[in-house]
Amino acid sequence: MNACINPYPYPAEISFNKAFNVGRLLHDSSAKNWIKEWHIKENLVAVQCFPLYSILLALNQTTVDFFSLDVEGDELQVLKTIPFDKVNIKMITVEYVHQTGTVDELNQFMVGKGYEPLIRMHKDDGTVTDVIYSKKS
């Protein structure tokens, strides 16, 4: 499937900036400002994006053992589209470095959805900036 995870709860065609390991959707002003702040050259392509829940339903798979989310800044917005009462994701790794908001806001959201942060991983060079969450039993 050639598609992306949509930060909105509906399908849409969105511009994606191809930029090696920091490519991202350009769907709002904060994403566009991020591209400018990081001095990233624009190299746009239109991509079809779907909410994660729609993809899981199409695959008839609403239980996920492990989900890694790294979308260069839209992590919390993507998580907010997931109906956690209808999907059983047992463990989630979320990159937090490029997102709008703080890691504390991310933790607060995930705890509110029934998850506990297990570990916050961080390397000073920025290559590892993730939190691992486990669903509470």
Predicted features, each with a name:
Residues M1-S137:
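Phosphate/nucleotide-binding beta-alpha loop and adjacent structural elements of enzyme active sites
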